[in-house]
């Protein structure tokens, strides 16, 4: 291949993946949404790829994934990897962007708990294989140990390290560039206007009206201000499924995974995305938000203009989650339960955040973000 990747052929095996269709939504560079089934690859095929391309053998297990086929390769109890077979709908430059990002982090911040690329035996960070007549790109990365954050009990004690780790990640990404970084992505808060047409797929009237107001406020109060704020490549998806914690000490972050939604966007959108999943159920809905922001600010100081937009950006991220999930569920009813798994909690959080006055919200955040740190 002209880009240096090697194409290898693998025989067809019976798929061990669920025969229930799982669909992935991928935004193209032309801002048009493409829908493509997740590639069907068996554990046998994945193991053959590992052996031929990476010279590795062991036990292969299927992992969950919305867009790609992911596998855990256990070579020894102390040596594990994640093999990712990338969705054919993902543009090659977007895949290269994610690979380049991980290589950049390995060089700039080797101490960060993020996946590390294992090159092929030919020394390539990616390879390309043909399965059932379809060319698919493949990436092998280190498998990070830890318990998914969503399985751990909510803990305010985790927030300082989580916020600090995200800030250190963003510090490492500062200055990183790639031609595909400025891609069109539905999950990019700074492009929230592209999701508004999907409001028609929200069936509940009260929720529909609330979401409409959220998008209206974004258009009038947020979008104009975002254009003046600093931008860089961000992770853009620090949800509890993409954070790993120490199972014996769930106040310690052991991994940040899944850079599939990384994008060049306003830095404050990184913080807003993470905080959209940290609205508490207790008497103080900002119980986890405040220590997270304080720790982030300590490592990556936020400006007053950025802090002032956080409440609306958090609400907008929740609006994206609710709208996109219900649109996809209407298209793929067989996968409805999985697609809607986060909707009830997200709707509850959006309603809660609406009860908190904007000035009060901003004041509490400013109190833990001293000017002299900026």
Which stretches of residues belong to each language-model region?
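A cross-family kinase active-site recognition segment
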Residues: 149-209, 229-231, 337-342
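ATP-binding pocket architecture of kinase catalytic cores
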Residues: 79-177
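Conserved NTP-binding catalytic cores of kinases and kinase-like/nucleotidyltransferase enzymes
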Residues: 12-122, 247-249, 368-373
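An alpha-helical support segment within catalytic cores of ATP-dependent transferases
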Residues: 39-50, 177-178, 193-236, 246-248, ...
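ATP/Mg2+ or Mg2+-diphosphate-binding catalytic cores
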Residues: 321-374
